[in-house]
């Protein structure tokens, strides 16, 4: 069975966009039983910018509970916290010593984020190498990524090939799995932009922690066009198309089926429907989340996942140490 690695960074706020674009597709992928899946909380990656310590700690636990509440099955997905596996940073250092500055500085995200300030951390430059360590220590075959992250998987491949050539076969060569993850959900107020968990305008973003009344209010206030006909046309009707995508995922109904029912009903009726089905679905998730949050089940799941992760990483690290001359 091929091994697949994916991560979640505990920053910002989990949104409906995260659920539809990343969490639900992960659940669906796990249910195919085609892959051995590892899911890690990328808390070390979060430190490339300052995080308030208590808030970060709290968010890590909440994110794990929410992923589980959304249907991630720990019997099918190995879940662990990145920083709990201390072999990973050690592996990362050896990989850094086999990575060129030019490679790291060419990463598009580094170029973009380093423009915003003069005093960015070295971690912003080197975190793609830490990402390579995340991928390579467990010999992942596939890493599901969007187009913007593909470059980082390609760097991991280059590092692995170089290390193998220099020191002998050590790493499996991973491949990016370019995801069309579910549907990209747009901001309710600005349907030309994706719904972001760091969005400054909360009225356009549905959080998985929002109250049902707030969810309904936000959807009723979603930006739409003026012709009052419900049909799918992302170019000319981005707002309504976004709501159709949301309703389709929330209910399991096809977009054609929804259009058939609501095409001539008017936007008010359609928005009310979308608001109610979305609020109901998120309420179900929140009920599971509240039961999980302070339960011992999370600790048991994380301990089990960490043990597997450590066993894989220790074996890889000892092999690397021997090959580079450290023992």
Question: At which residue positions do the language-model features occur?
Answer:
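Internal, conserved structured core segments that host functional sites
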Residues: 107-163, 167, 187
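N-terminal Rossmann-like or analogous alpha/beta NTP/dinucleotide-binding catalytic cores
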Residues: 2-5, 10-133, 277, 286
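A generic secondary-structure signal for well-formed alpha-helical elements
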Residues: 64, 71, 99-102, 140, ...
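Short, polar/flexible loop-turn hinges at active-site or ligand-entry regions and domain interfaces
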Residues: 52-53, 143-146, 230
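Short helix-capping/linker segments at secondary-structure and domain boundaries
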Residues: 101-105, 137-144, 248-258
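Conserved nucleotide- and phosphate/pyrophosphate-binding catalytic cores
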Residues: 151, 157-327
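A secondary-structure boundary/capping signal
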Residues: 40-43, 139, 181
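Short, histidine-centered active-site or binding-site loop motifs used for metal coordination
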Residues: 8-10, 43-45, 141-142, 199, ...
